[in-house]
Structures are given as C-alpha cells and as structure tokens.
Amino acid sequence: MVYSYTEKKRIRKDFGKRPQVLDIPYLLSIQLDSFKKFIKIDPEGLHGLEAAFRSVFPICGYNGNSELQYVSYRLGDAIFDVKECQIRGATYSAPLRVRLRLVIYERDVLEPTVKDIKEQEVYMGEIPLMTNNGTFIINGTERVVVSQLHRSPGVFFDSDKGKTHSSGKVLYNARIIPYRGSWLDFEFDPKDNLFVRIDRRRKLPVTIILRALNYNTEEILNLFFEKNIFNINNNKIQLELVSERLRGETASFDIKKNGKIYVKKGRRITAKHIQELKKDKINSITVPVEYILGRIVSKNYLDPKTGETIILANTELSLEILTKLKNSSFFSIETLFTNDLDHGPYISETLRIDSSHDRISALMEIYRVMRPGEPLTKEATENLFENLFFSEDRYDLSSVGRMKFNRSLLRKKIEGVSTLNKEDIIDVIKKLIDIRNGKGEVDDIDHLGNRRIRSVGEMAENQFRIGLVRVERAVKERLSVGDLDTLMPQDMINAKPISAAIKEFFGSSQLSQFMDQNNPLSEITHKRRISALGLGGLTRERAGFEVRDVHPTHYGRVCPIETPEGPNIGLINSLSVYARTNSYGFLETPYRKVHNRLVTDEIHYLSAIEEGNYVIAQANTNIDKNNYFIDDLVTCRHKGESSLFNCNQVDYMDVSTQQIVSVGASLIPFLEHDDANRALMGANMQRQAVPTLKTDKPLVGTGMERAVAVDSGVTVVAKRGGIIQYIDASRIIIKVNEEETYTGEAGIDIYNLTKYTRSNQNTCINQKPCVKLREKINKNDVLADGPSTDLGELALGQNMRVAFMPWNGYNFEDSILVSEKVVQEDRFTTIHIQELSCISRDTKLGPEEISSDIPNVGEAALSKLDESGIVYIGAEVTGGDILVGKVTPKGETQLTPEEKLLRAIFGEKASDVKDSSLRVPNGVSGTVIDVQIFTRDGVKKDKRALEIENMQLKKAKKDLTEEFKIFELSLFSRIKKTLVSFNIKEDFLNKLPYEKWFKIDIQDRNKKKEIEKLLQQHNQLKKEFEKKIEVKRRKITQGDDLAPGVLKIVKVYLAVKRQIQPGDKMAGRHGNKGVISKINPVEDMPYDENGIPVDIVLNPLGVPSRMNIGQILETHLGMAAKGIGNKINNMLKKQEKISNLKKFIQKAFDLGENLRQKVNLDDFSNEEILDLAKNLKKGMPISTPVFDGAQENEIKQMLKFSNLPTSGQISLFDGRTGEKFERPVTVGYMYMLKLNHLVDDKMHARSTGSYSLVTQQPLGGKAQFGGQRFGEMEVWALEAYGASYTLQEMLTVKSDDVNGRTKMYKNIVDGNHQMEPGMPESFNVLLKEIRSLGINIELENE
C-alpha cells in the first residue's frame, strides 16, 4: 500500500477483512454539485438559472405589439471574499446581469413585422454564492441549505386501509401530483361511485371531468366497459359467448347446446366448464328473457323511422323496452359486461349521479367549485379548465413526474410532455378501476422510489422563478401601457422582487439553517442532512409513524441510525456514506456486479426503483481469493425482503460493510455490538463534542476519521506537491514540483491559516501546521490541522484510562468520577470565543456617542478603556465590566436658574445623557482578543478605528510584499539557471543587482526569448502586486454599508478558557453519557500494580441494561493499543537499534487477519521509522470498520502481544487505603468526548432582577436573568411539611408582593431582618380575570 507523506507519520492498524473496492466519495458533493448545476450556464436550458429564464421569457404585452426576450446571463465577481463578508456582516454574493432584447412589432399589419429591436444588459439582483465547503454566508453568518425529501411528482395509487368508513371498507384513490400546478385526485366512496377532486376542493363525480374532456355518455361507457352482445332470432335470445366471462357465476338456467348440458341450473361455473365450452367451440348460447332484463345498454337506441329515443345509453333494459326494440327491428342489443368479482359497474353507477349532460355544464360545475361566487361565462370556464392541467405556464409535471407517470401506467416510453392530456387522465382512471377490481396493487408512498431529493440548486431555482413571475406581471403592464419608442429593457425590469425572493429563501426558509459548527463532523453531517419538513414537505404534527419508520429501501441510501430524538425523529435523516442522487433526484447506492458466482469490481449505481428487480448479496458474504462465492446458499435482499438464495441467482453484491450507515454512525467502532437506540445517541452526541485545546486522535477508530477531517474543509490540504519553503503559525509556502507547474507561472503555492476565529457555536477555530520546513509533500497531503483534527484525522475527544467499578456512590445514575490529573494536563480544556456588539444609532434626540466620558462611572470601571472608550486588546474582563463606553441623549428637562448658572460656568453636560455602555454579561469572564470597528460612510472615524485600519493596512502590505518577494525569488532562480548554463559564474550573478541580469547579452536566440518572457512575467507580477495592494487598501479604508440609522458598530471578541469541572456533560461514542460528579485528587484514584492511576471511573451498571457492549470491546482494544505504544516508548528510551524497532512495529501490524491492509515497512527509511515510532509511542491507533471489525480472538491476541491479561481485567488498589479491591476490574482506554453542555452556560443565580409586567412575578430562564419557578407541586411539598412561614415567604415577598419585597430590601439594607408580607399581585390578576367574566368580586375589610 502506498502511503502519502502525512499517512506515513502515523499508520492506523486496520482490522478490516474485506478489501475496499470503492473509495469513499467526496462527502460534500450533494451540496456543491447541486449549486454548480444552478449557476452553470446550461445550453439545453434544463437546469438552473437558464431553465428559470426560459420558462418565463419571452414576455409579451397584452396587445401583442411588443415582446421582451431573454438572450443570456452572466454572474459577476463577488465584491468581498468569504472572510471579509464574515467580518463585515455582509452576504457573500455575486451580481447577476441578464442580456434582454426588446422587440417591437409594426401595428395594423396582417403579418406582424419587426419595427425595432433594442438589446441591453440588465442588473437583476445578487445571487448568494456557495463557499468551497458547501455553505453560504448570509449577513455575515455561515448557513447551510438542507436537502429536502419530498413526494416525487407523478401518479400515486393508494387506499385508506379501511380507516375512513365505519364499515371498514377499503376505499381506493389515485392522485396526480405535478411539480407545480393543481393536484388531481380520484377517489371511490363507500357506495363505489368514483369522484374527482381538484386541488383538494369539493368532490365531483368523475364523469364531469370526462365530459369536460368532450366525451359523451356512449364514449365514456365504451372507454371503460367490455360489451355483451345479445342477438334476437325467432323470439329466442342468443348471447355471443366469451366463455371466460362466465367463470365464478352461478348458472340461473341450464347452459346447453345441441342437447348437451354443460352446466346445470344452480351450479357454479368453474374453469373445467369453461374448458369444455372452448373445446366444443361454443360461440353462443340461448338465454331466457330474464337473463337480459336489468342489464344496462351501452349506447343510445333511436327509432329509425321517427327518430324518437327508445332507450338512452346507461339505462336498464325492461320487458317493455325490449319489446319496443324488437318492434323497431333492433335484433342485436349491446349491454355492459359487469360482475361483482372483477368488472365492477363503477363508471356506470357514477354517470347516474352526474347532473351534467354536456361539456358546457360540466365545465360550469368545475368553475363553480374552483371559483365559487364568481359570474359564469363560457370563455371563463373554458380558460380555467384549460389552464388547470393543459397549459405549460400553470402546470408542469417535470421530467421526473412524466417518467414516474409513464412507469406507473406501464408505458414503454418514459419521456413526454410536461402537461396532462386526455389519455393520461383516462389511463389513470382505468388503472384505479383495475385496482378496485383486484388487478394490480397500490403504491407504497414511503418507498424511496416515490420520494426524491430536492437539493439547494433546485430550491434556489424555484425561488428565483417565483421572483421572475412577479417581475413578469409588471413587465406585461409596462409593455402595454408605456411609450415603447423610448423604453429600454432596463426600464422594464425591477430587480427588487427577484432579490426579495432569493433573500427570503436564504434568510428565513425552514431549510436554510444556521450551520452547526461545533466540530468538523457536525458541519459535514449538517450538509448531508435530509429533511422531510419545509415548504412543500410534511409538518411535524401531521407526520405519522409510517413516514418516520425505517423502510427497506433506505438500505445504502439513508442511515437507519442517525436521526434526532424528539418530535423530529425519522423526519430528519442523514445520507449514507456512498449514497448519491441521480439526474431525477432519486437516491442511489453502489453495488458490485456479479456474473455466474464471480464478484467483479464493476460498480453500478442503482436507485430504489431499479433495485427491487435484482437479488443483492451482503458485503460480508464469503468469497475466495479469486472473488468467487464460497457458499452455495447466500443471504440476499430481493424486493425488500431478506432470505437465502442460490449463489447462481445473485445479480449484485454490496460494495462495503459501512454502506448502510451515515458518516456519523460509521465513526463508532464496534457499532455492530451496540443497541440501535444507543448507537443513535452516540452518533448524535459526537456532533456535540467541543474541540479541545490539545487534540488527541482516537486509539480505536474506524478508518473514516481521515476522510471526515479532509472533506470537512477544516484542514489545509496541498493543491500540488512540492517542498515546504516557508512556515510559520499563520502561513505555509510551498515551492511546487517542476512537473506540476504551468508554463509561465512562478510555481509557488501560499496557504494562509485561520487563527483563533469564532465559530457559529462560539467554539474556537484555529489551524496549526503539521509539516516541517524543507519536507517534501505530495498533492492532497494535509499541511495543517484545524479544530478537532490530529495529523489529518478527526479527533473529537481524548483517550482516557477508564475503570468500570463503583466508587463511593460518585458514579450513581451514570455520573462520572474524574481524576484531577485530567484537569492538570488540560486534557479537556476548551477555548470559547464570544462576540459582543455595541451599536451607536442616530436617535430623535441626537446621535449616540461612543466615548470614555460616561456619567456616574468611577475611574476603576474605565481603567480598561482607551481614550475612544473601547476596551484594550488583552484586557482580562469579568461580568459587569464596561467593554465599550456609550452615552445616549435623553429628553431635555426643565432646569432651575441655579442649575443653568452652574452649567454655564462648568460646561456640565452629564445630566442630559444616560449611560448605555456595552458591558460583559453576568457570569462571563475572559480575555479580549480582538476589536472590530465599522463606521458608516461619511461619519468621522475615531482614533481607535484609524489605529485598527493602519494595523490592517500594514499587515496586508507585509503579507503581499512577502508574497511578491517569494514569487520574484522563484522567477530569478529560473533566470539564474538559464544564465549559469551559459558559463556565467554564479558568484558574479549574486553580486550583480537583479535589474542588471536582464541586460546580459546571450547569443542563443531561444534562451534570450525565454529570459525576455520571464522579464515580461516579472513586470506583470509587479503590476498585479500593486493592483492587489490598491484593492486591499480601498477595501480597508472605505466606509461600511450599515443598516439605516446606525452610525457605528463596535464588535468585541472575548476568549474564555474552560477547564472540565463537576456538572459538565461527557460521553463516549456508544451513547454512554453522564455528568461529572467530582474531580478527585489523583492520589485517591484506584491504581494498578505498577502504580498507574485510572483517569475516569464509570459505573458498570450502565452497560447491561443499555446493551452497548461496543464500549467494553473498545476499552479492551484501547488497552492493547496503549500497551503496544508503551513497548515502543520503552524501546525508544533504551535507544534500541532501528532494525529491532522496525521488526517490532512490523510484528504489531501483522497481528490478526489483516486482509484489507498489508503494511510493509521495508520501503521506509530509518528517519521515517523513527518518526513513525515517535507518533506510535502514545499508543498504536487501530481501525475497526463497522460490521467488519476486530473479532474477539484478535483482541485477545493483541492483549497477549502487549503482555496484558487476555480477560482485559486487572487488579486495582484503593488510592485512599492502599487495599486491593475484591475482584479484577475492567480497565482500558476509551475515547471520551466533552459535550457542548457546559455547567458554566447553565448555572445561574439571582437575588433581584426583572419582573413580569402582568403578574409582577420574576421572569424565568437564564437569558432573562430570571428566578427559580416554585410550582404547585413544590407548594404541596411545603404544605406537607407544614412549613407555613417558608411558604408564605415564597408566595409573597420572594415573588409578587410588590410593596412587601421593596420593604424587605430596605429592611435588609438597614440591618433589620423582618418581613411584612402583603397582598400578592397574582391575587389581583385573579380578581381581574373573574371580573372579565362578568362576575363582580370585591374584597371587604372586616
């Protein structure tokens, strides 16, 4: 196996048994590909902005004299880059410019001829751009647009499963769902009549829509029924026999022919009877008159002589009418063939309740339902019906809808028009009747073949189209009203509606969410999330159990484990590792093709619709070294069921064992040994882990860690290979390999690192280089670690030495006992950064002012502020400290003559301003790490703002100058090479200034040209550098675009260092969570025979009932991994030969069945072995992929190799007494996480504070600085104890007795500890409520 530069530093021992056939795909492609499709110019106009423009344009005026046509569009460049937008609170977007053509036609001419054409580029608002990591910056905050799982357009057949009607009768229905437009529902009622609903309005008989489609009664009956033909000869009635139709009926007369009786009267007609009739070629039988009476005729019969109607279609035959027909010489009568079994008379019955008799009356009936109360006209009714389903402007089935529609109706062709036609509606009704007749089955709406993914690009396109449609109306008005000769396209278009639609979507849509940025995993999971909620989706309240449940088609597409607990369970899912969406938006998953027992490496992606037809084997099926199945019977999936199949029947095989789970769940080692509920908690809690100050890779991982760290975008990855030329904390510079440079470029890559930046969740984003100077690196190597990554691997927590044992009740109910050593070593210390803003506004009474001159504030409070009134960087502040001094003007008060005089003498201004400074919130303390000042254009900048500006300018100039110098050096080194090849001495060149190098005359013309080219390049570089500096200077010095009325914004960033403490929540990766109960001195912790104390003590009772055994296996394997690390460490300390070290490490890698990974250290140099050993001395990292991990015997082998007991249990001694504990204890290394539920954020206390206006009781919650609720159950408790005075205190002075609490406060200040309870305000509220009911109630004094 070939290792990259960073992988060589620390190799994970992999226990995977099955080779990795398919690499893990780029994990953010669902977001990036979708948005790329949206903004990329699509010549066919099927996707993105192009499709939206083409669907709305051209726009014609109402009078048809003019037309506005769309030509093309282009996206400009963003004004600010991503980081600048985040700092300034701006949106990262690009201007959209559209080329439009206004065509004016000649009036009063029969053939329209073009009079004038005007073409112009028009600005159409801003389009937010996606960053490289799949997010959007909206108003300075990073947001993610979550993909939506919605019902696919098409036709769906369903039933109510007998729940609607009291009789329990199953009622079938069909629904045509377009991508946009009106829904069309067909449904049976309990009487078996068929109805239609448009847009869920009042139901109408289905025949109304058929009449509206211009069918008469005869045509309707012809469409849906087979005919029985009765011939009348010599007063005998002969039935033209279709023998299959008789099956299942009871003969009401003897069925005979030529004297032979085939079926006796009263007998049921069976298949055997029908066979006999066929055998004897019986085509007709004589039937009694009673047999034909009551049957329904299929067409109108008119008297040929008089033209009088004898009988109308869909009427029952009676003896009288039969005689009339005979008399009018009708000797052949057509009736409808119906029976109770499989040819129901539904349409015939529905025609009877239909009040309409022709097309116009049907259209009017539809109009009355859709537009009740509006006046009826023939044109209006026709227009409405035409626009409902047959107009491209109002109805769009989309290519997906048409494909699903045609597939559902078993048509051969799956493409077609995107509107409905007559045949579509009739075919749907026919299929629904077939289902009612027992032929065919209803659809499963939770099948992933009926639900599709709508990603960012598609949702943005829909929003954009909505904006365009709003513009279209205005344009039509202007084209009809305005003076066309002077109008230009620019005057037609108002970009506001488009911008508003886009802004509304990205800013306030339910699916555009504030990014979860706790750690790299939470970012990646948020971008891969799939929600069934949102516009056009489900709502929490209406979603039933079936929609939320795991469906067989989720296999390999949607994770069955990762979903939130609570009301959203099952509605918000996560994409599986290998899943992707196809061109129609359906999820598909990869499989390996199988040919005659041979499993090939050919990969096919199948959607849920296609998958049902194949037999698919599991990924862990046994195959030999030639990739043939070993067993004859193999466990497979087919049509959603799992069972054993002969290996010759197998079509496909799963690609990987981790195919079914999401990224989050695939990071849980030994997932196969955990209960699903706990695995769900484990996957969810990993997303809440706070990045620690010192990162530590997991000793026991799953091999997914590197993929998550790299794809999340928090690490810095090399774009091209080369040598590290320069490195410091904030930038890495690489001299690119010659073969990877383009012609005419300097061959230098510069990577700037992010330092101590605040994330959305107030955690700290900081990147640290993990490479050294002059090291050779390859493309895609990790250069710098971000938050929660260690040498390019995800590192969410710390490896802790844990013991499973009770310890003096400190681990009761999942509590965790932690050693003081963990705090001392800063193992779980985290940095949190808070942003506090102070806004200076222009008020009615005058502008607010930011200054250090604040009324009634002592010198001490202002000691941390500079003369501009803004806190210094580096100041340590605590709750209540002033960060930014601000004064607000208050209303003028009447002054006495004395005050006026004093003010005139001393210029005293303090009385007409009030203090509105920004202070540190209660309970928060930290260090000021940065200050940003934004000043409105035209407002004078203060001294501090100018200082910050100068600093930024200096830094930008220094960075760009250094960059330029490096590029320049690179260029001159190339020139030096060329000149030295002409026997010009290097020493001579070094003494010569660079400018004179170009003047050296060379005979070789080609080389001379080359040098001239390099000179041009140098000049070009210089120009670019100057331009860059100018752009940067302009950006830094220009005024900021602030909200109306805002003069200045000061943002102060506070960094808080938080150590772990009692009350913090911790968890493992298996759903084993708990709260720290005590930080115990290290000397009191249990220790082993070597005197090594444990770090954490966990409760063993937390394991059996929770059934998450994965944590125990992880602990054992972690112990073995640490043991190997200790051995390597001892060898390093003893300075053993590198060959011995190499042998030992090779031996460790060869333990167990390493079928996936064969590590060969022969290719490694001595330095590389030493580097590897140094990184392995803290423990050998292990990868145990989900469902393909280490077996029990392999863990024992590892423990044995580390000279540890194979039981994984060791004897421990009590740290306080030194006594040995009664029995051996499970001790090992578990990966523990500190979750973002910190006691500092939750702990809160109040003495006095704000009160509710109505009840006068203290507010609730930390945010409102509220009190503790003393509810009715607490009142009962005090009543039960008889603590009457305590209770009185609680209900009066400590709550809503306004006078009492004021008096009590005064008494305490005076040192008088007495209280006088009065009337609680809530009693007055009760009186008022009773009075509001019209009952007078008064308090009487006795």
From Swiss-Prot:
E.C. number(s) listed in UniProt: 2.7.7.6
InterPro entries: DNA-dir_RNA_pol_bsu_ext_1_sf, DNA-dir_RNA_pol_bsu_external_1, DNA-dir_RNA_pol_su2, DNA-dir_RNAP_su2_dom, DNA-dir_RNAP_su2_hyb_sf, RNA_pol_bsu_bac, RNA_pol_bsu_CS, RNA_pol_bsu_protrusion
Keyword Transferase included in the entry's annotation: yes
Reaction(s) catalysed (UniProt annotation): RNA(n) + a ribonucleoside 5'-triphosphate = RNA(n+1) + diphosphate
An example molecular function term from Gene Ontology annotations: ribonucleoside binding
GO cellular component, one term: DNA-directed RNA polymerase complex
Entries under SUPFAM superfamilies matching the protein: beta and beta-prime subunits of DNA dependent RNA-polymerase
Keyword Transferase included in the entry's annotation: yes
Entry keywords, A to Z: DNA-directed RNA polymerase, Nucleotidyltransferase, Transcription, Transferase
Subunit structure, as described in the record: The RNAP catalytic core consists of 2 alpha, 1 beta, 1 beta' and 1 omega subunit. When a sigma factor is associated with the core the holoenzyme is formed, which can initiate transcription.
PANTHER family: DNA-DIRECTED RNA POLYMERASE I SUBUNIT 2
Entry function: DNA-dependent RNA polymerase catalyzes the transcription of DNA into RNA using the four ribonucleoside triphosphates as substrates.
Family: Belongs to the RNA polymerase beta chain family.
Alphabetical list of HAMAP family matching this protein: RNApol_bact_RpoB
NCBIfam families xrefs: PRK00405.1, rpoB
UniProt name for this protein: DNA-directed RNA polymerase subunit beta
Taxonomic source organism: Buchnera aphidicola subsp. Schizaphis graminum (strain Sg)
Name of encoding gene: rpoB
